[in-house]
Amino acid sequence: MSQKLDVLSKYPDAVELGELYRQAGFDLYLVGGLVRGELRNTPGEFTDFDMTTNATPAQSEQILSAWGEHIWDIGKEYGTISARKNGAVYEVTTYRAEVYVADSRKPTVEFGTDLKADLIRRDFTINAMAAALPSGEIVDLFHGTKDLAEGVLRTPRSPQESFSEDPLRMMRAARFAARFNLTVAPEVFEAMRQMAPRIEIISAERVRDELIKLICADYPRVGLNLLVETGLAGYVLPELPALRMEMDPSHRHKDVYEHSLKVMEQAIEKETDADGPCPAPDFVLRFASLLHDIGKPKTRRFEKDGSVSFLQHDVVGARMVKKRMRALRFDNDTIKAVARLVELHMRFYGYREAGWTDSAVRRYVRDAGEQLQRLHRLSRSDVTTRNKRMARSLAQAYDDLERRIDELAAQEELDAMRPELDGEQIMAVLGIDPGPLVGQAYKFLLNLRLDEGELGEEEATRRLLVWWQEHGES
C-alpha cells in the first residue's frame, strides 16, 4: 500500500497547482524538506515549496504566469521558475542532473524527463523522496523513509559519485547528521574520508554557510565529530582536530578537543529565547565556545615541576580565530565578536584569584562591550572539572562578579541622572546666590526625578517654587 501525504487540507494551493500541471499533461512533485518533515512528523510551517516537474522552464513559466500573483525567472538557467501566491513562494524546477567535472566549482546542468534520474542525483536518500501532486502519493525509490526511521544517512547512488559531482555534499552530510542526530552509513563515511581533499575546490563562502548551519543545529557535536574523524576538518577548520593532540590534565578530559565540545554544549544550554540577550541558536557564542582554546597547541609548555602551561593562549587563540574566519569569508562584525570572546575568556580567573577593584570590573565590562552577555555564558561554561567543590567555587566567584557588575551599572545609571534644572537655573528661579541652599534645592529636584521620573522644566520649576515656599525662605 502506497503512502500518502495529506496535501489537500494542508497545502491546497500546491494541490491546485498540481492539478493545473496535470491538465497541461505534466507531472508535478513536492520535494525537499517539506516531504522529509511530513514523514518525520515534524512538518513545521512552510511558506517555501520546492517542486520538480517534467515540464520545461518555458512551459512552467506559462502555467505559473496564469496561476501566481507574481513570477520570476532568476533561476531559469538552472531550470527553476518561481511564483508567489497567498504569501507563499513556489519554486518549480525541471528534472535535471548536475555534474561537477574535476577541479570545477560549478555544475553543468542538463534537463531531463525522468523523475528517477532527477531524484537519484540528489544528495541523500532522506532528500530524494517526492510527493505527487495533486494526489500526495509518496515516491520513495531509494528507501529514504526507512533511512529516516533508522537514523542513517545514505546517498541514492554510490557516495563516490555523489561527492564527486558536488564535494560540498560531504559538508552537508555532517550538517544533516548534526541536525537530525544521524549516523552516516559506513560507505558514506569511507567516501568522505577518501575524498576529503576535494572539498578544496568548493568556494570558502559555501563551506562557511554549511559550517554555520552545522554549528547552529541541534546536535553540533555529532557533525563536528564527523568532520574530524573523516579528515574534512583538516581542510575547513584545521585548528579543531589539532586540539585532539593536546593533553590538558586540568580538565580531566582525554584532550582539549573533548573539553571544547563540552564547553560548547554547556554554552548552548545557556542560550535564551528570542527576547533574551543570546537568542538560540547563537552562532557567535557557540563558535567562540568551540574555539576558545585553539591557542593551546601553539602555547603549550612543560614546566620543571611536571605541569603544563598555556600562557597567553587566549591572545594567540584570538589571532588564530581571526585568521581562520577571514579565510572562510566571515563578515568583520562576526569575526570581531568571536575573537573578542576568545581573547577575554580567561580574564575572569584573575577576578577569582585576586579580586578586582571597581575600576577593574569596569574595564572588564568596557573590554567586553556588546559581547558581555555572551562572555558571561562562555566563562560559566568553561568549567568542565569533575571536582564539584572547584565547580561550586568558580560558579560562586562568577556570581559575585556579575553582582558587582550590576551594582556598578545601577550606580553609574544613578550618577548619570540629572534633574531638569542645574545650579545656575536654580539660582535664577529662586533669586539666590551660590551657597548651601542651592545644594539643598538641587537635592530636592534630584530626589523628585528619581521618585517620579522626568517632569519637564516647567513642572520642575513650579515644584521647586512650592518647595522654596515651604523650606527655603524659612
Q: How would you describe each model-predicted region?
A:
Residues 1-474:
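Catalytic cores of the polymerase beta-like nucleotidyltransferase superfamily
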